[in-house]
Amino acid sequence: PSRGLGDVYKRQVTSNGSVNGMHDSTMPLSGMIEMLNMQINTWFGGVGVGWMNYFTFIIIAVFISGLMVGRTPEFMCHKVEAKEMKIASIVALLHPFVILVGTALAAYLYVHAPAFVESEGGWLNNPGFHGLGEMLYEFTSCAANNGSGFEGLGDNTWFWNVSCGVVLILSRFVPIIGQVAIAGLLAQKKYIPCLLYTSD
């Protein structure tokens, strides 16, 4: 029986590997929504690092809103300056960058090194657009620490295990370092009394 929309949110939105189904048989629009949920990487706060990703986007939003109204941006009664913004921007851009680099590498190898792909047993059971979607979904799921997959992809090979491990480390642990650095920078700054027009 169908478990409804809540089942999709539990499977795709949580960042803790709690997937309970494989998604190769979903319709194209459903597959796109499943990927989008993981690529946003903060939907409903996620679990665990989802809150830290919210923190990154809040820093960016506070900085932009401060520029729009002509005030020095403040968050939690501390000034947000260029150093915090640079770190937050790098953290926000790292997630899609790692996903796209991994997908581009896999697509390049599939097209230009077919002997290597065949030596690993072949990867794609569904060539064409859906095959590209399977590769994109694999790296998206690794980067979002989700654990699901479009299982038409033969991903239990040396290449996929190593590349997905690298993507997981880069997209999970490097942002945590940046987010903790932002928290440390804000903690060192002087406390500013919160007023009605601050964004706290």
Predicted regions and their residues:
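Membrane-embedded translocation segments of transport machinery
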Residues: D7-R71, K86, H95-E134, S141-S148
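Extracellular/luminal re-entrant pore-loop and selectivity-filter region at the outer mouth
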Residues: G149-N156
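Alpha-helical transmembrane segments and their helix-start/interface "positive-inside/aromatic belt" motifs
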Residues: A82-H95, S199
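Hydrophobic, well-ordered secondary-structure elements that form the walls
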Residues: G17, M76, L136, G147, ...
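Alpha-helical transmembrane segments
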Residues: L67-E81, I182-L196
